[in-house]
Regions:
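Bacterial N-terminal signal peptides that target proteins for export
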Residues: 1-8
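C-terminal motif of bacterial Sec signal peptides marking the signal peptidase cleavage site
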Residues: 16-19
Length: 506
């Protein structure tokens, strides 16, 4: 989830912070910076008020627990299943659950992760599945139930460890800087000063010779094609060296070295020439000195083939009527969209109440000559009111997928999930309790199936470390371990797994 969020906001920053050298441009950049700041601040307000994100990524922890207490099933085969004893009945009877813990230990400079089963073994209330610690020097992993030592590799040598597992998929030179500071940078929405300067440099290139005209509160911009060609590698350099993204870029650049070179070659031999045949424009509408609508288009022979549009209606509550759309059109076929994406949101966020709905729809061309990808439509909702005492939390998602004509599945598939419970906010902690989870799937050929779960589940966000994750002091250096030593470790692990299987509480 963090990578997706980071990409969205990095993209937004590129779109809404553009600069060039004349008076109109200075006005545009000032307006866009103010608009960008208001939009990002609103998102940060939501995250900080309801998930303590800024505090957690400075120092804190999060904990999730799940216990099943009841279940009910509806559908064509529901009665036959309910009349027999299932593994769910055993899980409920023996109070088997799962616990996840995430810790950001600022003092130790380490992210710590722990996953454990509750009551899965006889007479053992908690069984560690895996514990992981990512520090500035080493990455450590341990599973105390099956091995009493900690596996350790240098934090910058994760690629070498992956190459030991599968040398065909992971090259030996895949040195990944997966340190505490790297992961911490990934959590930031805003780039550091050096990264921002690179984006500014790329934007200066793009707008150096742009033609800007103004009609009231609307700006029309036509970009110079040679500047567009120079802008693309400058933007790639900015993304590549972005303090938040450089880790991911270097990882994929080495993992997909051949593909990266092919893209670069194609840009230099084909794409540059095609860019010269295009017209690149922007239309910017301003309301109350803030961006109300911003549209970018790429046109070939008078036909728009790429369109990106974003709109923000109310900056006091930006989440309400926020829209983003992206369309790629077939230049040779009238009114035929190769792909069309639309994101919309509505609702409101205050210090105590968040009531947010968002939708994402993706459509592909229905062309008999090309494979048709599914139509995807998703809706999500989040509601929390920390001023109320009960029934003040709800989160849900529903999704509809229309398969392609070549798919073996006939008709749309509809999936939905909803969780109900309560939220309690203290000065240094937020606790979400989940009482029921409802899931449904409706398929044309199989009918509708509904599953309702009674749960004792919770998610806690805390400014403090709720509990620490302790690793075994004795370590195994993964990169220095010999084949014969691995065989001994394997035998010990298998023996412990066999012993544990006799203690299963299932």
């Amino acid at each position: 989830m963090k990578r997706a969020k980071l990409f969205v906001f990095a993209f937004m920053m590129i779109i809404v912070t553009i600069s060039c050298g004349n008076k109109d441009t200075k006005n545009i950049i000032s307006i866009k910076k103010a608009s960008s700041e208001k939009l990002i601040s609103a998102f940060e307000k939501f995250e900080n008020n309801f998930m303590l994100q800024s505090d957690l990524f400075d120092h804190g922890s999060a904990k999730a627990e799940f216990f099943l207490t009841d279940y009910d099933l509806e559908g064509p085969e529901a009665q036959a299943i309910l009349q027999s004893t299932t593994i769910a009945d055993t899980i409920i009877k023996n109070k088997i659950g799962i616990t996840g813990l995430w810790v950001n230990d600022k003092k130790a400079q380490a992210f710590k992760y722990s996953y454990a089963f509750n009551n899965i073994l006889t007479n053992e209330p908690k069984t560690d599945l895996i514990n992981i610690v990512i520090g500035q020097k080493n990455i450590e992993a341990a599973s105390l139930s099956i091995f009493t030592k900690t596996f350790s590799i240098p934090a910058q040598d994760l690629g070498k460890a992956l190459a030991l597992i599968d040398s065909k998929e992971f090259p030996a030179n895949l040195n990944i800087d997966l340190t505490y500071n790297t992961l911490k940078a990934l959590s930031s929405i805003r780039p550091n000063k050096a990264s921002q300067k690179r984006y500014d440099k790329a934007q200066d290139i793009l707008y150096k010779n742009a033609v800007i005209t103004r009609n009231g509160d609307t700006y029309s911009i036509v970009f110079n094609n040679d500047d567009v060609i120079k802008f693309i590698p400058a933007l790639i350099d900015a993304v590549k060296n972005d303090n938040r993204l450089t880790f991911l870029w270097k990882f994929y650049e080495k993992l997909l070295e051949k593909e990266f070179k092919e893209i670069e070659e194609k840009f230099n031999t084909e794409i540059k020439d095609k860019i010269k045949d295009c017209t690149f424009t922007e239309t910017l509408s301003i309301t109350n000195s803030l961006v109300a609508q911003d549209q970018y288009t790429v046109t070939v022979s008078g036909k728009e083939i790429v369109t990106f549009d974003c709109g923000i209606k109310n900056y006091e509550n930006p989440i309400d009527e926020l829209t983003y759309s992206f369309t790629i059109t077939d230049p040779e076929t009238p009114d035929a969209n190769i792909v069309s994406c639309m994101f919309t949101s509505e609702g409101s966020v205050t210090d105590t109440v968040a009531d947010v709905n968002c939708s994402l729809a993706i459509f592909f061309t229905d062309n008999p000559n090309t494979p048709l990808l599914p139509v995807f439509d998703m809706h999500g909702a989040f509601y929390a009111d920390t001023a109320k005492q009960d029934d003040n939390f709800q989160i849900g998602m529903d999704m509809s997928i229309t398969p392609s004509r070549n798919s073996k599945t006939n008709g749309a598939i509809e999936v939905s999930m909803q969780a109900l419970g309560s939220v309690v906010k203290a000065p240094d902690m937020i606790t979400y309790n989940i009482d029921t989870i409802s899931m449904a799937m409706d398929e044309a050929e199989k009918g509708k199936h509904t599953l309702k779960l009674g749960t004792e589940a919770s998610v806690i966000f805390s400014k403090k470390i709720l509990e620490d994750i302790v690793m075994p002091k004795e370590t195994v250096n993964v990169l220095e371990t010999k084949v014969t030593e691995w065989q001994t470790i394997k035998e010990e692990v298998m023996a412990n797994l066999k012993a544990l299987s006799t203690m299963l509480n299932l």
